[in-house]
Amino acid sequence: VNGEQTVPGSSFTADDCPAPTDPYAVSKFEAEQALLQLAAEGTMEVVIIRPPLVYGPGVKANFLSMMRWLNKGLPLPLGAIHNRRSLVGLPNLVDLLVCCLGHPAATNQVFLVSDGESLSTTELLRKLASALQRPARLLPVPQGWKLLWNHNFPHL
């Protein structure tokens, strides 16, 4: 809902103007607006929680793919990624949900939840490798080379 990126060195906040960029994000934003309208009419109370990537037992999608790559010991061209990404552990997300259920000040608020540390893809892979007790074989391939490769070989 917030968008795909922030100004380098900054993070998203609940006060940011939403900037959804794809149909899924637009639909989430429209649902939030509809719920907030119902809340404004006194029909119901709403708490909006916008989690980043959630990790924990049963994790799937990109996070699981990264774990599989590391478990296989594959060299990855991701050793020079300087992005920042927030994450939230499942227990922390559940704690926030429970807190919001019982706290009247949460009513009609928007919360961005995270573990409080933003990691680059490179840092995340190193931490995952350490937790998996596997080597992080990360090659520092410059971003320009990756863009050139993806442009010339989009199906690989």
Describe these PLM feature segments.
Residues 99, 103-156:
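Mid/C-terminal beta-alpha module of Rossmann-like enzyme folds, strongest
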Residues 19-47:
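Active-site Tyr-X1-5-Lys
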Residues 30, 59-65, 79-102, 108-112:
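Substrate-positioning beta->alpha
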Residues 17, 67-78, 134:
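A short C-terminal helix-loop "cap" of Rossmann-like NAD(P)-dependent dehydrogenase/epimerase domains
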